[in-house]
């Protein structure tokens, strides 16, 4: 297996001394002032719920970040997409993987991901440690820094699926032809990424600076991905596949740090109720580590789905994740992670 690093071509063009100063100062501002974390994460559990941490939010506005709707006659709002049930064994088998670039289109996608990875590392204060240097102080991540990274990552991760689904929907209307199942899978992916974001927002509320960064990143990314998908959907799906490889790396490292005791505030933190309901988390498996295992499994599934879609003929092939196959005894693409293929299914395997 081969994991990607945060190294990008742009980094080589910046003097080391300047890069160190910029990264330390700029990422520090975001990591420390971008969020207001819940008391159970960064402070003693005996502190009151009204205790305010570093934030730009006025005191009078402190309340649940997104409370349920005030509709007396509505009990709850159901989702159209029910999440598949993962077993603990399946989630623990998820591993870091990398699909080798095989042609110029793959290299374009991979190079773009590496450049974006560098930018995301900068704004979230994350530094990926080389092997054997994980315990050095400059690579240490706190609970607050991890939440900053998770929220920023998930706030833009829901864009590709929505853009792809929207463009394929319009294409189907314009050509007056069926889409053969692509739209549903892409929209469901966007919905899943949004649920990741809503879950993490139950643990920390972004301040004005974080909101500004998300607004700018989402605006640029949406328009850039929109134009790119019009030009080459296949490169875009490969790009998302590589991006999800990075997401698996991020969550894997966070899980390992919890296991190593490096994030003590998360050892007793329970998953929010929104996560328990969405993933159907069983009793006794609702810790912060369990939550990250579920999120990582989702990212691994998106990695497989987009690498698979990137292998297909975008114009005529049906979506293998919405297809019923003639031979049910053989492994085929599905919504679960029982037959997970980290680098995607090849076209000859599914079409």
UniProtKB/Swiss-Prot annotation:
Q: Which organism is it from?
A: Aspergillus niger
Q: Which cofactor does it need?
A: Fe cation
Membrane topology of this protein: Multi-pass membrane protein
GO MF, one term, reads:
alternative oxidase activity
Which GO terms of type biological process are on file? alternative respiration
Query: One Pfam family from the UniProt entry?
Result: AOX
Instruction: Identify the taxonomic lineage of the organism of origin.
Output: Eukaryota, Fungi, Dikarya, Ascomycota, Pezizomycotina
Entry similarity comment: Belongs to the alternative oxidase family.
Q: Its encoding gene is what?
A: aox1
Q: Which residues are noted in the entry as Fe cation-binding?
A: 154, 193, 196, 245, 299, 302
Protein name according to UniProt: Alternative oxidase, mitochondrial
Origin superkingdom: Eukaryota
């Amino acid at each position: 297996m081969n994991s990607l690093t945060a190294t990008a071509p742009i980094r080589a063009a910046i003097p080391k001394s300047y890069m160190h100063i910029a990264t330390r100062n700029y990422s520090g501002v975001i990591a420390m002032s971008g969020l207001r974390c819940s008391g159970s994460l960064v402070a003693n559990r005996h502190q009151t719920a009204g205790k305010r941490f570093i934030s730009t939010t006025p005191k009078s506005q402190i309340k649940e970040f997104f409370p349920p709707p005030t509709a007396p006659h509505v009990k709850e709002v159901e989702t159209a997409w029910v999440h598949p049930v993962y077993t603990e064994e399946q989630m623990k088998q998820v591993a870091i993987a990398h699909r080798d670039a095989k042609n110029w289109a793959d290299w374009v996608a991979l190079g773009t991901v590496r450049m974006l990875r560098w930018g995301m590392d900068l704004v979230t204060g994350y530094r990926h440690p080389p092997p054997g240097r994980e315990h050095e102080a400059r690579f240490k991540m706190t609970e607050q820094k991890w939440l900053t990274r998770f929220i920023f990552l998930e706030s833009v991760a829901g864009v590709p699926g929505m853009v792809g689904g929207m463009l394929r929907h319009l294409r189907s209307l314009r050509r007056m032809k069926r889409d053969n199942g692509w739209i549903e899978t892409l929209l469901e992916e966007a919905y899943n990424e949004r649920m990741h974001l809503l879950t993490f927002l139950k643990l920390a509320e972004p301040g004005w600076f974080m909101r500004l960064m998300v607004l700018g990143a989402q605006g640029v990314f949406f328009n850039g991905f929109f134009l790119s998908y019009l030009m080459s959907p296949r490169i875009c799906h490969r790009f998302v596949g590589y991006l999800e490889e990075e997401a698996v790396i991020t969550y894997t490292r966070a899980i390992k740090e919890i296991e190593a005791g490096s994030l003590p505030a998360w050892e007793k933190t329970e998953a929010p109720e929104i996560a328990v309901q969405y993933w159907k988390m069983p009793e006794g498996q609702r810790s912060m580590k369990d939550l990250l295992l579920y999120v990582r499994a989702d990212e691994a599934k998106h990695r497989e789905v987009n690498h698979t879609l990137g292998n297909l003929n975008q114009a005529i092939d049906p979506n293998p994740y919405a297809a019923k196959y003639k031979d049910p005894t053989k492994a085929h693409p599905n919504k679960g992670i029982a037959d997970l293929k980290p680098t995607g299914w090849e076209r000859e395997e599914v079409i």
